[in-house]
Amino acid sequence: MLYKGDTLYLDWLEDGIAELVFDAPGSVNKLDTATVASLGEAIGVLEQQSDLKGLLLRSNKAAFIVGADITEFLSLFLVPEEQLSQWLHFANSVFNRLEDLPVPTIAAVNGYALGGGCECVLATDYRLATPDLRIGLPETKLGIMPGFGGSVRMPRMLGADSALEIIAAGKDVGADQALKIGLVDGVVKAEKLVEGAKAVLRQAINGDLDWKAKRQPKLEPLKLSKIEATMSFTIAKGMVAQTAGKHYPAPITAVKTIEAAARFGREEALNLENKSFVPLAHTNEARALVGIFLNDQYVKGKAKKLTKDVETPKQAAVLGAGIMGGGIAYQSAWKGVPVVMKDINDKSLTLGMTEAAKLLNKQLERGKIDGLKLAGVISTIHPTLDYAGFDRVDIVVEAVVENPKVKKAVLAETEQKVRQDTVLASNTSTIPISELANALERPENFCGMHFFNPVHRMPLVEIIRGEKSSDETIAKVVAWASKMGKTPIVVNDCPGFFVNRVLFPYFAGFSQLLRDGADFRKIDKVMEKQFGWPMGPAYLLDVVGIDTAHHAQAVMAAGFPQRMQKDYRDAIDALFDANRFGQKNGLGFWRYKEDSKGKPKKEEDAAVEDLLAEVSQPKRDFSEEEIIARMMIPMVNEVVRCLEEGIIATPAEADMALVYGLGFPPFHGGAFRWLDTLGSAKYLDMAQQYQHLGPLYEVPEGLRNKARHNEPYYPPVEPARPVGDLKTA
């Protein structure tokens, strides 16, 4: 054994060939600060070996290196800029020394090689991969950019266009694509990976492969003519501006850095990467996006822990076909759980099956499946007008009309047709689960399961625990949601649960602004362009359905009369009374016509102004700051109340529910991350300016206490150890 660290070891393999093996405790390898230091020490040992002829890098895990240790990021990002820059210089010196070894090097890459893992293998001369490879640089999705030389080596290896596509989008690619663009040199079966890598090394050692020529382009300026450079970088900047926008500085910074570094050799190019990385790491956007990643891991880990003792349902059923029922049936069948889809009429069943078939055909068109797979999946969805097969189902989700009487009747009838241990769930969006449970003989086997539309795209499923829902019931429903590829978050019961409970105060803020003379178009523009929502409130209401919102608004007002009962007729009332239900009937805040792809396209409609004039004061201008404050304060206050009342368990789960269920702008990180970034005292000052607008603007006492003591909702993060302590090699 030449060297042994906590996460890697170095040993002789054969006749002058050494192997450096990543083998961290636990299930995966991460390129954390300690591993970077160990790698430096191991390379130091290699540099002393006079009989070294070649080096093979590999992993003892199912994946090569999944990336940097993101749990370290928030503390690293608090390190002063000079110290962070110093540590990056140290880390890059390690990879440079790996790249500069006087012998050929190869990485035998299996599974994931992401972020720092990808940057590590870019420093070797050759890369051989297994068919399950996923390799790429996802850093821009975390609000940063590659910091271990990825933005320098990848463009010089692949050419600017392919590298920009991966780096700016934070993409990873599979084995076939990696081979095609030159990111790996070969793909072999897993059992032949090490032997194949040794064979390549022997060819390089014997002079059959010119490893020095292979290495050289990574050390030099990027080989692009002036015209090629102008075209590549201009197109890339245009695409990034269009897709990422101003709220996500990392992608455009990465493109500009690669452009600026193109004319330099490795050392100067790495210095430019360093200078760009450090300021990005200190942005609120990076902290928010890293926070989302960590919250996502927390939520998924919690679901895994919750379901460890239950069996995932093997047969499901959906009550109520149509678009929603068809979407749920498709998602279940697509992920391998056969489903019975029941309705009371053929027309709805046809609609549900058509929806499922349409979604499968899209997968076929994209090349994700072939005709055989399509036929196989669709055959596991069984449409029925009766309860045939319900005696075999493990779980039933009801997705009928949002009417408590209808839902109770359907659930009570279904309970008589299923086994004693079958779980029932309701896909209600607002009706309290404990109320629906009153119709059942086995309320302990019942809970809420709130999907979001469109089901196949929206990652969140709210799992609602009723007063009598058992832990086993919740665990089984969480297991099914996870199997369907969704992110389940368990909440306690109340009108609207969590997501809709906090959404309707936001809509109330919108209604009050319109009442006071604001223009709905300006509100939408501000909330989209400035705050960053994917849709402004007017457009969102049109998509959700004015009739749906009108009904839900009444349910919420009955549930929370003190805050949500209004004493005036609002824009939603006016549009509803005029039979303007949004996109579903082509008339809402806008008029809708189908474009060439059959998608609804909004157009101005003068009739809306007349309708809104009846429920509004004369038009006046509002500043962007006031619009944002008046829209967000009611929502954030309600989010805080939900935490204080135990409706949602943690700030992390609340923020993920907002991001995954409502599209809360990820660069803000969610309501609690936004609050912490803004500061609770500053938020309180802002909210107090608008408390005259009513109870929705009154800040909860718990948040007032936070403001008094300047306490954040997320645990404070300590800066990483001084760089001198980090740098141990």
Curated annotation (Swiss-Prot):
Q: So where does NAD(+) get bound?
A: M324, D343, V400, V401, E402, K407, S429, N453
Q: Name one GO biological process term.
A: fatty acid beta-oxidation
Identify the keywords attached in UniProt to this record, alphabetized.
Answer: Fatty acid metabolism, Isomerase, Lipid degradation, Lipid metabolism, Lyase, Multifunctional enzyme, NAD, Oxidoreductase
Instruction: Note whether NAD occurs among the keywords.
Output: yes
| Top-level lineage group | Bacteria
| An annotated Gene Ontology molecular function | 3-hydroxybutyryl-CoA epimerase activity
Relate the induction remark in this record: Repressed by FadR in the absence of LCFAs (fatty acids of, at least, 12 carbon atoms). When LCFAs are present in the medium, they are converted to long-chain acyl-CoAs which bind to FadR resulting in its release from the DNA and thus derepression of the transcription.
Pfam families xref list: 3HCDH, 3HCDH_N, ECH_1
Write down any Gene Ontology CC term: fatty acid beta-oxidation multienzyme complex
State which Enzyme Commission number(s) the record gives. 4.2.1.17, 5.1.2.3, 5.3.3.8, 1.1.1.35
According to its UniProt record, in which pathway does this protein act? Lipid metabolism; fatty acid beta-oxidation
Outcome of G116F?
A: Absence of both enoyl-CoA hydratase and 3-hydroxyacyl-CoA epimerase activities. Delta(3)-cis-Delta(2)-trans-enoyl-CoA isomerase is only slightly affected
The record's listing under InterPro entries reads:
3-OHacyl-CoA_DH_CS, 3-OHacyl-CoA_DH_NAD-bd, 3HC_DH_C, 6-PGluconate_DH-like_C_sf, ClpP/crotonase-like_dom_sf, Enoyl-CoA_hyd/isom_CS, Enoyl-CoA_hydra/iso, FA_oxidation_alpha_subunit
The record's function comment reads:
Involved in the aerobic and anaerobic degradation of long-chain fatty acids via beta-oxidation cycle. Catalyzes the formation of 3-oxoacyl-CoA from enoyl-CoA via L-3-hydroxyacyl-CoA. It can also use D-3-hydroxyacyl-CoA and cis-3-enoyl-CoA as substrate.
Assembly behavior: Heterotetramer of two alpha chains (FadB) and two beta chains (FadA).
Matching entries from HAMAP family are given as: FadB
Q: What is this protein called?
A: Fatty acid oxidation complex subunit alpha
Organism the protein comes from: Escherichia coli (strain K12)
